[in-house]
């Protein structure tokens, strides 16, 4: 391990710019995230949303790009994907995938689907087959 890697302990958070902070918070709370912390910095409302060890920073931005960028998607590790797919679809989230997709990743494969968030971000729900 090199000297730089020795100081890196893992991913800390994913920054998500939005023109609608509360709408973004509500969206992620609907997926089970909680507000880890919220701050007013110079009149701008910042929030960190937490689910397990995943942290998303909701960044106020009057003119976010609202398109795919350098970060392609956020992936959430899940269990019981069929049950989760039905719950998310029934809750009215914007589905990108109309079915669960099987892919030959990992030793026995993986199953996933994507939804679209309020800022055009793509959220993947993925179960590694065991």
PLM feature spans:
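Helix N-cap motif at beta-to-alpha junctions
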Residues: 20-21, 78-82
């Amino acid at each position: 391990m090199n000297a730089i890697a020795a100081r890196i302990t893992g991913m800390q958070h994913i920054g998500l710019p939005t023109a609608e902070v509360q709408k973004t918070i509500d969206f992620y709370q609907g997926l089970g995230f909680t507000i880890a912390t919220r701050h007013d910095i110079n009149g701008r409302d910042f929030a960190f949303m937490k689910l397990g060890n995943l942290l998303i920073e909701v960044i106020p931005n009057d003119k976010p790009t609202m398109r795919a960028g350098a970060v392609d998607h956020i992936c959430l590790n899940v269990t019981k994907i069929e049950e989760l797919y039905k719950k998310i679809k029934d809750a009215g989230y914007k589905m990108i995938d109309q079915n669960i997709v099987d892919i030959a990743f990992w030793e026995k494969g993986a199953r996933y689907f994507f939804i679209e968030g309020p800022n055009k971000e793509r959220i993947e729900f993925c179960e590694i087959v065991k």
